[in-house]
Amino acid sequence: MSKTLLVDGDNLFKIGFHGVKELYNDGAHVGGVYHFINTLRRFLDEHNHDKVVVFWDGDSNSSIRKSIYPQYKGNRRQDMNDYKYESYLQQKARVKTYLEEVFVRQVEMMNNEADDLIAYYCKIATQENIIIFSADKDLTQLISERVTIYSPVHKQYFKNGDKISINKVDIPHQNVTVCKIFTGDKSDNIDGIEGLGEKTLVKLFPVMLEKTCTIDEILDYARKNMHPKSPKSLSNILTGRTKSGILGEEFYTTNSKIVDLTNPLITDEGKQLVEQIHTDTIDPTDRGYKNLMRLMMEDGLFNYLPKNDEAWVNFLKPFMKLTRKEKRNTNKN
């Protein structure tokens, strides 16, 4: 099977933009651009991929989930001043231009989140071995025999059979979805069962550490083990009680829809674009290394390369491998 790298673009870009603060060119911050391109370059240098696809959140990307759960991401606040936000947008747009020149495919669609677009790609690309490059643990739901996660933050692979640490509790990857449905997700403002965190969940249902579990199996286990001295959290599970009140089955229906990435929330237009990116070849017209070098010189990135004659060649080599493969695919067709 062919080897494909799927990159969570916003996740990787934010790491560099907020983390690499010292790189500037003529007074303009370029840390986000340099970190993204250099991190991708280094990963490609160490691995052999036939295709690379970067996924971006589209405009109004939360709209589908907000139509189901209005509070979704209601806790997110713009923490950048106007100047910094303008730099963020400019650098992100610049990264996309760089990627065009090195034959990296890109997916972005209004009203669609990158996570769902990635999930849909994994669903349809049944003949590809896939590495997802992201520090977002939500994507660990997609781990399978042919889908592996690489976290650039932990510098660690998460593969089929591994456990995922969620709030310091190691959960088998196949139970991450069920765990998040019950406990919610504070970072996305998704309520969970009141009084139920990951530690309490696995204490009440230790079977979750041993085998794949479904919502119905957990609820059935809760009913069978309910007694007058049971902890309140067990009763809350059966009634679907959150801080917003008793929701019953509606709680599980709603959380399943907005949490479960194995059933991605994606528009028809999003599906069509992913299918197109999956099967189409890349048009090589007007793409090339001269353009890439020009961009790097304009942004002053050459200042951050090693001071030797081979610096440019070594920087470009990993992208050259990918470009040759994509050009061969184009010529076949």
Each language-model region and where it sits:
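Extended two-metal-dependent nuclease catalytic cores across DNA- and RNA-processing enzymes
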Residues: 2, 22, 77-283, 290, ...
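Short glycine-rich phosphate-binding loop at a beta-alpha junction
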Residues: 6, 50-58, 106-108, 129-133, ...
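Non-catalytic, usually N-terminal nucleic-acid engagement modules in DNA/RNA processing proteins
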Residues: 1-71
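Short, low-complexity, polybasic intrinsically disordered segments
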Residues: 69-75, 79
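Generic intrinsically disordered, low-complexity segments enriched for polar/acidic and small residues
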Residues: 33, 66-69, 85, 147, ...
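Long, highly charged low-complexity segments enriched in Glu/Asp and Lys/Arg with interspersed Ser/Thr
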Residues: 286-333
